[in-house]
Amino acid sequence: MTQLTKYLLFVFLCLSVIQLNAQQNDSITDTNLVTFKEVSYTLIGPVKKGMASFYSLKFEGRKTATGAIFSHAKYTAASNHFPLGIYVRVINPKNNKYVIVRINDRMGKSMSKKGRVVDLTRLAAKEIGIFKQGIGKVLVQKVEKQANK
């Protein structure tokens, strides 16, 4: 084999590896995107496993930790595991249904000790299928809204 043939073979192999790596990076990016209510979000960070419950009716109309007025008709949640103001995806692993909710409140300390990761609104709990039993196992992960294109 001549020097030129070896060199061309080396360049071809390098370009093949670069192309394969680019294809793998594209697929990773695609799997990190989720859509909820026609808005795209990027999944960020580790998944937190735990239990979810939903707020009692007595909290309707009260102020949350962020100062917002609580409503069971919104996609919000309380959590002691995530910062206030961020969005998270909450998945019910039994049926793979999920919601995106904004963390705008804190839970009572006793709820965290019981393994609760989030306390959802009734709307969110119904959407992922934990409303009837009142509590359910969930996977929770931080998300960020994608910029409008």
What are these regions (language model features)?
Residues 2-7, 21-149:
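Secreted/periplasmic proteins
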Residues 8-16:
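Bacterial N-terminal signal peptides
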